[in-house]
Design a protein with these regions (language model features):
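N-terminal glycine-rich phosphate-binding loop for ADP-containing cofactors
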Residues: 1-300
Length: 300
């Protein structure tokens, strides 16, 4: 509101937030039709994607100008509708949360990271978490809790949340920018996994195969993408695929999250999700849209 008085009538007010709903940011604006989200990805000079977020009152002209701006600075834009976490953050979190959940289950950190690399991800989930910073992840989670309270929704505590709490409160390891996180960062030489991980997260006798771990990464993100598509958060299949590859490094060999589902085969994919859901919980439960596609023989 303070800044708006210095802008002309056609100026666009854009936020680079990766999680806070744009509509809630625009509610105090005198020109909510000129308010939009432009989510850049880090490191900005390397990452080609821009996620453009339409708020409830964002005008079509504001959207068009923002798309043109993205192309002018040689970025690839995708357009999504406003929702907590939007599309990319929401689906990307499935990758990191699955890694944290495996740690809580007693899977070896080295196996988790190796399985992710073998699956085609550029960086393992634990290394990504260290780069983001565990304190930042905790702050994002706190914001979600506040949003849930505001909307009278019950907040669930997941295994991944418990791992974050232990890393911050018990061992004070918050990532690369702190004293180290899941990895150690020597002044000279390469980073290596923290040797005390197993002290705080004991190893289970039952270790998963690399294929099982890989599937958990692929399927958790593909299922969340389907939910986003089902809810109208993202309306374009191509944007979903492009966003997943350019935004957070979903394996390009799979063609994107929804292309992965199509190529796997809808009925076969649905059967696998059900098995994963029976084993690991409702986060793998097949969305209704997937069931409808399976019954109709259609694809994304």
């Amino acid at each position: 509101v303070e800044a708006e008085k210095y802008l002309n009538k056609e100026s666009i007010f854009a936020s680079n937030t990766s999680t806070i709903p744009i509509t809630s940011l625009a509610k105090n604006s005198h020109k909510p039709n000129n308010f939009i989200g432009i989510h850049f990805f880090s490191p900005v000079h390397r990452m080609k994607l821009i996620e453009i977020i339409k708020a409830k009152k964002t005008s079509s002209m504001t959207l068009l100008k923002t798309i043109k701006y993205a192309k002018k600075i040689k970025k690839t834009p995708i357009v999504v509708n406003d929702s907590p976490g939007f599309y990319t953050t929401r689906v990307f979190e499935r990758y990191t949360n699955e890694g944290l959940t495996m740690i809580y289950e007693g899977q070896k950190a080295k196996s988790i990271e190796k399985s992710a690399i073998r699956a085609g991800y550029p960086v393992g989930p634990l290394a990504v978490i260290d780069e983001i910073n565990i304190n930042l992840i905790a702050n994002i989670r706190k914001h979600k809790y506040l949003e849930n309270e505001k909307n009278n929704n019950k907040t669930k505590i997941f295994s991944s949340d418990k791992v974050i709490d232990i890393m911050i409160k018990k061992v004070n390891r918050t990532g690369r920018s702190g004293l180290g996180g899941f990895y150690e960062y020597p002044n000279q030489g390469k980073k290596f996994l923290w040797t005390n991980i197993e002290k705080y997260f004991p190893i289970s006798k039952k270790q998963l195969s690399k294929i099982e771990m890989m599937d958990r990464f692929y399927f958790s993100q593909a299922i969340e993408t389907i939910r986003c598509y089902e809810e109208g958060v993202i309306e374009s299949v191509s944007d979903a695929n492009i966003g997943s590859i350019l935004g957070w490094g979903f394996p390009s060999s799979k063609g994107g999250t929804l292309k992965f589902v199509n190529d796997y085969g809808i009925p076969k994919f649905m059967a696998r999700t059900q098995k994963l859901a029976d084993k690991y919980g409702n986060r793998f439960a097949p969305p209704r849209l997937l069931q409808k596609l399976s019954e109709s023989g259609k694809i994304f």
